[in-house]
């Protein structure tokens, strides 16, 4: 029997709070770039390990540090003066043993650097990766006891730590709007139509009773902005686009503010949020893994959260990754499939050395719809939790295929 517990939630629904704060750091924010690189390196290493060794070997690449460069954005152009410095650290197996006893080497540094550069090329479209970045790899090899767990690929892995993951569903209107705003502004179709908007977009949502204020910091790409008037017109256009989205996504009142640090008395570039590449990493904003969005893509101080970084951790036995992703999948399925469940949040706690499908506890807190009790939904919720735990190694395949969000 697994340690699954279903309880009635004691906190009131998020919608009944007068104040709600929700944040998302867009894909071009330096912290998100760090997360994305870490996860890209882990995914490519995992695929390489599986191809060469037959299974994923030990690694954790969740230590990426970005040190900002220096740039000189100008209306209609600009230049990079000093490249962005990117340091890849962590641990990864650099060899494996064949059944014959022969040892084969794996070029971890080369693989990691190539994965990082490809992520940057695919994500920050105005960044010349070769000219504008310096990527250095200092990934070492893990200890023998950690590597040994990965030599038993057909067993349920043992938990690498005593840690926990959390998840909840459904999103509130504010959470949904914040997430969809950033996703729209960073979508490929949007970038084709509005290339002046860079990828470094931070959306902060504040709900005060029935009123939402979205404060958006959006890096504009200087070569697409001719002068101050063009910048201000583009900012108004962006505001209208966000307001149109908000009208479709929520019935609450929404006020949109963009680049509120701008000084509109200035007639040159110094008063406005301009970048050469579309990310503030080019000129003064550093980044680190785990300092931004949680595994569901948001930062939500009104909700249960884990401080664990999910990006870059191995998908085999690192419960700091697996349990956060698992909690998100479980809660979404429960809300979608179990009649009578209004909302759910849950926590899954591991115990170091124990099988990851046997957590110390998997506890769900449920708010039921009117007319339903915990007894009415307990069996179905337990069944879903048990199903996901029973098939917990599927998370590995989802991660290798890039199907799950980690930031």
Curated annotation (Swiss-Prot):
Keywords: ATP-binding, Magnesium, Nucleotide-binding, One-carbon metabolism, Transferase. It is an enzyme of class 2 (transferase). It catalyses: L-methionine + ATP + H2O = S-adenosyl-L-methionine + phosphate + diphosphate. Its cofactor is Mg(2+). GO terms for biological process: one-carbon metabolic process; S-adenosylmethionine biosynthetic process. It comes from the Archaea. ATP binds at residues 140-145. The keyword Magnesium applies. Pathway: Amino-acid biosynthesis; S-adenosyl-L-methionine biosynthesis; S-adenosyl-L-methionine from L-methionine: step 1/1. InterPro entries: AdoMet_synthase_2_family, AdoMet_synthase_3, S-AdoMet_synthetase_arc. One of its GO terms (molecular function) is ATP binding. Its EC number is 2.5.1.6. Catalyzes the formation of S-adenosylmethionine from methionine and ATP. Belongs to the AdoMet synthase 2 family. NCBIfam families: PRK04439.1-3, PRK04439.1-5. HAMAP family: S_AdoMet_synth2. This is S-adenosylmethionine synthase. It comes from Methanosphaera stadtmanae (strain ATCC 43021 / DSM 3091 / JCM 11832 / MCB-3).
